[in-house]
């Protein structure tokens, strides 16, 4: 079976041998050649590891995949897609992924202690509000995390676990057990939209959640994928229908309240391999970010065909994107 490495999520793990060796593990979202076109393949999630964050060795079999199990009705024939993984302080890994049966995408959750053997728990909104959101299309989850020394771990806020999620808008959900989640609603009993697409900006079509959100001194940082709309409603500085990466900051006391948002992307398709493949309009689709060896490694999908990495060194920042430097100019 031919696999195309696609989108990834990452996590750190320490391994004791003759000394402590820090390994970087990634979960690779791969698609086979059973179908033609985006959305018609069968997706599986694999496992790879690295000692430098750049060169990876992966095992030959998937670790999370559509099987003959309790989730078959949600995952056959489309599979398991778009993984986002984080870890609790006691070492339990939690993965949120899209269960795709080619009819309706649903956010699913699974847990593991070794990143290899996963226990599926099913759709995360199945029990919420008596199943109100069970048959609604849901995907793309970014759980709230914090830094514990140099390790990024799942965090609570106001006594609850917090999750940003959504593709067309950014929504939120809370949980007490990491498995059963309750969407945050507005006073009218509908999903509360935290941020939405903006006319004339790089995220004019979609604002899709990406890696786990991170508590910082200034607020909660959520990096997300923005899709540029074609025509007059999009940002003419970027290709129509292209995917770029944005940032939004939420209030620490009220995690549903945005307090700052970039008007231009901090990562955009520029290289040839980011503009060729299954999605030729240009795609840098971020899904995994980790603090590794005192640097931030951001892993992203290149045109739905390859996996790339961008590295930020806080001690030696690189040159800013010229679009950001000139962001005050007319569009």
PLM region spans:
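Short glycine-rich, acidic/polar surface loops and turns
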Residues: 274-276, 284-287
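Acidic-residue sensor for enzyme active/binding pockets
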Residues: 81
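Active-site/ligand-binding surface loops and adjacent short beta/alpha elements
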Residues: 212
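Donor nucleotide-activated moiety binding/catalytic core segment of transferases
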Residues: 203-209, 282-285
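Beta-rich carbohydrate-recognition and catalytic domains
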Residues: 1-15, 19-78, 87-205, 215-279, ...
């Amino acid at each position: 079976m031919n696999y195309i490495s696609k989108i990834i999520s990452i996590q750190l793990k320490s391994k004791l041998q003759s000394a402590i060796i820090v390994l970087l593990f990634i979960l690779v979202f791969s698609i086979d050649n059973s179908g033609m076109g985006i959305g018609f393949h069968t997706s599986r999630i694999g496992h790879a590891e690295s000692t430098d964050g750049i060169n990876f060795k992966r095992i030959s079999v998937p670790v999370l995949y559509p099987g003959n199990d309790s989730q078959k009705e949600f995952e056959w024939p489309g599979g398991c897609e778009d993984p986002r993984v984080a870890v609790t302080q006691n070492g339990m890994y939690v993965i949120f992924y899209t269960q795709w049966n080619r009819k309706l995408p649903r956010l699913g959750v699974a847990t593991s202690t070794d990143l290899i053997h996963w226990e599926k728990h099913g759709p995360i909104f199945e029990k919420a509000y008596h199943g109100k959101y069970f048959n609604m299309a849901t995907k793309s989850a970014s759980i709230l995390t914090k830094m514990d020394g140099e390790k990024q771990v799942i965090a609570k806020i106001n006594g609850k676990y917090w999750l940003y999620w959504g593709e067309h808008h950014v929504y939120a959900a809370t949980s007490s057990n990491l498995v059963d989640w309750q969407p945050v609603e507005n006073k009218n009993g509908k999903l509360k939209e935290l941020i939405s697409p903006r006319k004339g900006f790089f995220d004019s079509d979609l604002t899709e959640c990406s890696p786990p959100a991170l508590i910082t001194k200034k607020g909660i940082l959520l990096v997300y994928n923005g899709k540029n709309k074609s025509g007059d409603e999009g940002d003419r500085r970027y290709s129509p229908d292209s995917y770029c990466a944005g940032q939004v900051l939420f209030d620490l006391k009220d995690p549903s309240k945005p307090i700052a948002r970039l008007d231009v992307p901090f990562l955009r398709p520029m290289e040839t391999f980011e503009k060729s493949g299954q999605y030729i309009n240009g795609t840098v689709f971020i899904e995994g970010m980790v603090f590794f060896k005192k640097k931030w490694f951001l892993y992203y999908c290149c045109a739905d065909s390859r996996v790339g990495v961008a590295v930020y060194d806080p001690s030696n920042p690189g040159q800013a994107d010229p679009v950001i430097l000139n962001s005050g100019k007319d569009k």
